[in-house]
């Protein structure tokens, strides 16, 4: 057998073996993914609906800058693959609105969030991602504080205490790594 035919035969055999192995892995991964997806779906379903509560904001560690009423609603997007959280409140007496689009990446097993907010994000969109927690998830993103300045980090934790109580807490992360509570939303299901 000539060398190029032998090489071609070996390549086909290796490719077929790799494909077969990949199909086995994909079948196994698909089962694991379905379990994670169901868990994700169940979590999203518990969030659906209208919520109300208070939102606290800190601009300096330990120094409360604002405490205002907030209302929010979680709705499913694209048949429940994603969930949208839209909220309205006030910041130091001025109206404030924002939205998050939340998803669970079945490949990376990470929650992913995009966030826009009239006050906190100005005209930017923050992308965050992170791991599930026993009662929700925690994600981390970065945002710009000024031209030619190092980005600051932002960590958000969703904690679904029970079917009627949800706390969303966000922390500023300085470029040096120190963290400080920035925003805390304490929701209860609207009646």
Annotated model-derived regions:
Residues 22-191:
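Hydrophobic small-molecule pocket/channel-lining residues, especially in calycin-type beta-barrels
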């Amino acid at each position: 057998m000539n060398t190029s035919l032998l090489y071609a035969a070996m390549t086909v055999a290796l490719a077929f073996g790799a494909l077969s192995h990949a199909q086995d892995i994909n079948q196994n991964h698909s089962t694991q993914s379905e379990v994670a997806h169901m868990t994700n779906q169940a979590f999203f379903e518990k969030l659906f609906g209208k919520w109300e509560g208070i939102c606290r904001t800190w601009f300096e560690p330990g120094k409360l800058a604002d405490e205002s009423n907030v209302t929010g609603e979680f709705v499913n997007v694209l048949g429940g693959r994603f969930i949208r959280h839209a909220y309205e409140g006030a910041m130091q007496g001025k109206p404030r609105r924002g939205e998050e689009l939340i998803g669970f990446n079945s490949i990376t097993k990470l929650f992913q969030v995009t966030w826009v907010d009239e006050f906190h994000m100005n005209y930017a969109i923050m992308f965050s991602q992170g791991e599930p927690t026993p009662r929700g998830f925690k994600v981390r993103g970065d945002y710009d504080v000024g031209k030619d300045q190092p980005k600051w980090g932002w960590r958000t934790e969703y904690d679904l205490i029970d079917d009627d109580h949800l706390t969303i807490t966000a922390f500023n992360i300085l470029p040096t790594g120190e963290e400080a509570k920035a925003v805390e939303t304490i929701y209860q299901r609207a009646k």
